[in-house]
Structure formats: structure tokens, C-alpha cells
Amino acid sequence: MTPSELKRLYHITKVQLEYGLDELLPEHALTQLPKRLRKGLFWIKNKYPEKTLGERLRLALQELGPVWIKFGQMMSTRRDLFPPHLADQLALLQDQVAPFDGQLAKDQMEMELGGPLDNWFTDFDIKPLASASIAQVHTAKLKDSGREIVLKVIRPDIRPVIESDIRLMYRMARLVEQHIPEARRLKPVKVIEEYEKTLLDELDLRREASNAMQLRRNFEGSEELYVPEVILDLSSEHLMVSERIYGIQVSDIEQLERNGTNMKLLAERGVSVFFTQVFRDSFFHADMHPGNVFVNPDNPENPQWIGLDCGIVGTLNKEDKRYLAENLLGFFNSDYHKVAQLHVDSGWVPADTNVEEFEFAIRMVCEPIFAKPLGEISFGHVLLNLFNTARRFNMEVQPQLVLLQKTLLYVEGLGRQLYPQLDLWATAKPFLETWMAKQVGPAAFVTALSEKAPFWAEKLPELPDLVYDSLRQGKVLNQRMDKLYAGYRQSKRQQAKGQFLFNVGATLLICSAVLLTSNITVLASISAATGAAFWLFSWRAYRR
């Protein structure tokens, strides 16, 4: 560990102790090393005893800087790891930091573009429109068309800072696993691995540009969601240029109401957008917190969502979608046995899981929830309780499901903030039933057949040749198998013969030794020579 890393590690430890975060570690669960470390730093006291543990955790992460803020934001979605009072505080973390110098941002952009900004843009505003831990946004206009755009640029020299803190996180996670036995089930090293991948992905704006373009294609012409256009020719790894939009932030309820927005329709469209992304496109925006969602003000009676910042997206494969839909429908119908069986069938929990015990555990958790009116039930919290229960039965962490749960909680929270009477279940159930109907039965068979029709139309003329080639290859394969089997049998016969000759030779040599001790030298010599000959024959048999 370098001196700078030791200094940073001391600072991290000092901040944690100043906010009393050692309370997160139960005394009885600690080995001797962390106990001695705490005693060794006796002069560092909790400066904020009047605040709750959750508040202190949030404030400590804010003080430690952007890498830790983003880590806290990610951890706020892992409610299987943190109790609600901590997760709720982590969800309040804001990724807003002081902007860096606008001239430095301009220099970075010009380096990415390979020339002065004036070659491509006019009216560049050196004052940032927004600033976050990873990137900063400035406004300008395209020189050739006058179109308003925004330029998002990665903070210079942010990667070394991130990599340094990530290395320290790994060291701390390994120490936690080694010295706090109760924490091992939380797999802290694996948590850091997930975070590292997410964070490093955000450093490549080409990935975000690609995600935004895909989401824009998926909702092209839609009244429900608009995604700003990316100017791909001017974008690179550390710079993304896109269309500038004007909208009302979705959390600004007063402004939405002043604009005459149809709040009920807006809330329902949020749910529709989510389920369309998941079940139609298998590709969903996984960071839909209020800062990334705006509302188009132009047609308030027919409101349209605007999605920004596509750095984090989720995908589901066909099997995940089917099992997820069937699980949700199982909940709608209170069929907990089906929900338990689906978890086993999907491979989300081990195949040897006792389905009856699992069903009982799900029922115990979910029945009190479903005793409420449907309109008061949180869809996201049902999924959260389900996944937490499943993890007690050794369910492996499914990153795509964690992102899905996080996104659903965001969408549901926004929807009920916009329209408190929103019945997400009533909105979602017809959608799920329609989707399931398309996946099974005659209609699904016809759809699958039609999707494969171009492939089979291309391959049909080749079918006779393919059949002939398959038969010929099968015949050749059988001949090879027969030859290999014959060789195997011959080899076994030779081995048996060699073993027999070896045993006879050994017996004769033993006899020659006995005869020699009895001074019967002639017979001893004959027996020894014959035994040696048998050994020679056995060696030749093995060699074949």
C-alpha cells in the first residue's frame, strides 16, 4: 500500500469513526483486530451522537466524496443488505458536487473533438448547466443549424481517483469478510465487484450514447416517452453531445399542476413505460430517479415523460421475463405454491429447495401485505420481500432483478407522488395478462413460427442437402465409432494377455529363487530364463 493510499485509508477510517459508524458493527461479531483498531484510535470520537445512525451514515458518505456517494446510492437499492431506516437515508444521497472550472471543461472537450469548439458550436456557455460526481454538462448551439444542444464531459483525472478508492474498498471488504464472521453472508467483495463494474461503465460515454439511442428507437413516435437525440458524430468516450430539452422536473408537483398536467394519466403512463420497457423491449432505463425524469410541458392533457441519463440500463432474457410475469400473476391470484415452484424451475433458488417450506415462508411474508386494499400495496416492496425471502433459501444475487426492483420502486414512488390514488396493480395486471397470452397458446405458436419463417424460407431449398450431409456424416461417425471400439477391444485383449504373461513370468522367477536356495541350480536357471522370457513377451504385449 502506497503512502497516499495509507493516508486516504486513515481519512476514511477517521470520518467513519467521527460519525459513529462503528455502531454498524456488533461488538460480539468482531474478531480481535477491529476491536484493537478501535481502541488504538481512541482520540477519534463520535461528533454527532444526536443524529440517527442512518443520518450519520449518509453524511459520512457525502463527506467522503463522489465515489462513496455513488456507492451509497447503489446500496440504497440493496434492501436485502440494509434495514429500511438505513436504506431510506441512503436513498436521499444526492449526486451533486461543486462544478469544476468551465475553461478546464472546454479544454477537455476540445481535446476529445480534436479542435476548437468554434469549429462545431456557437454560444457555448462556460458556466455549467449541471454538475455531478462523474461528469459536467454545458450548453451550446450547433454551428451549422443553430440547434440547441448539451455537451456532457467526464471530469478530468476522475479515473485515478475512482480506481484508488475502489482498491481501498476491496481491501476493506476483504478485512470485513476475514474479521467479521456475520458479514460474510453479505459477500462484501462481490458487492464491490458489482459497484466497480457499474461505476467504470459510467466513465465511458459511448456506452451511455448507445443506450440512449436504443431507448429512443424503442419509443420512436411514442406519446408516452421521449428520449433526446444523441449527436453521435460529435460524441466520444469522454464527451457526449445531445439535443437540449426543456421540461418540468417530474418531482416539481406545483409546476406540473400550474401547467394543467393530467396527473392521473402521467402517473399511469409511467407504469406503462416501465412495463413496456421490461416486457416488450427487454431493455429498461435503470436509473429513473426524479433528477433524470422530466415532463414535456407542451401538451399537459396528453403528458409525455422525458428520460435523461441512460448510463445505467437493465436487460432481461426471455426466461427471466416469463418467470417474472408468472410470479407477479401468481401474487395477483395468491397462488404462493406456484410462486415457490417458479423460483425453483427458473434456477433462481437451488433445485433441492423444499418447495413447501419455501411456499410457507413466502405466504408468511406476503399475506399481511395483501390484507390491505390493492391500491395501498407497494408493487416494489412485494418484490423486495419476495427476493429477501428467496435469499434465505440461498437465492443467488441476480443483478438484473436488483436493477428491476430499484427501477420499479422509483417508478412507483414517482407515480404515487403524482397521483396518490394510483392503483399500480390495476394498471399492471391487464398488461401482464396480455403479455402472457402472447407467450403461450396457439397465438404464441403462430407468432414464433412467423418470426422464424424468413430463416426457414432461406434454409428450405437446402434441406435435402442438409439431410443427406447429416446422414452421410452419421454413417462416417458410426464407422469411426466401430473402428474405435474395435481398437479398444484389441487393446483390452493385449492388456489382458500382457497381464497374464507378466504374472506367469513373476511366478517362474519366484520359483527359480526357491530352487536356487535348495541348490537345484539347473531347474532354477531354466525357471529364471523362462520367467524372463515371459516378462519380455508381456512387455511386448503392453507396447502393442
From Swiss-Prot:
Lineage: Bacteria, Pseudomonadati, Pseudomonadota, Gammaproteobacteria, Vibrionales
Function noted in UniProt: Is probably a protein kinase regulator of UbiI activity which is involved in aerobic coenzyme Q (ubiquinone) biosynthesis.
Family label: Belongs to the ABC1 family. UbiB subfamily.
Protein name: Probable protein kinase UbiB
Binding-site residues for ATP, renumbered to this chain: L129, A130, S131, A132, S133, I134, A135, Q136, V137, K152
Catalytic residues (positions): D287
This protein's record includes keyword GTP-binding: no
Organism listed in the record: Aliivibrio fischeri (strain ATCC 700601 / ES114)
Keyword DNA damage appears in the UniProt entry: no
Disulfide feature: none
EC number, UniProt record: 2.7.-.-
Gene name in the database record: ubiB
Subcellular location: Cell inner membrane
Pathway annotation: Cofactor biosynthesis; ubiquinone biosynthesis [regulation]
A Pfam family per the record: ABC1
GO MF annotation: an example: protein kinase activity
Enzyme class label: transferase
PANTHER family, per database record: CHAPERONE-ACTIVITY OF BC1 COMPLEX CABC1 -RELATED (PTHR10566), PROTEIN ACTIVITY OF BC1 COMPLEX KINASE 7, CHLOROPLASTIC (PTHR10566:SF113)
This protein's GO CC annotations: plasma membrane
InterPro entries associated with the record: ABC1_dom (IPR004147), Kinase-like_dom_sf (IPR011009), UbiB (IPR010232), UbiB_bact (IPR045308), UbiB_kinase (IPR050154)
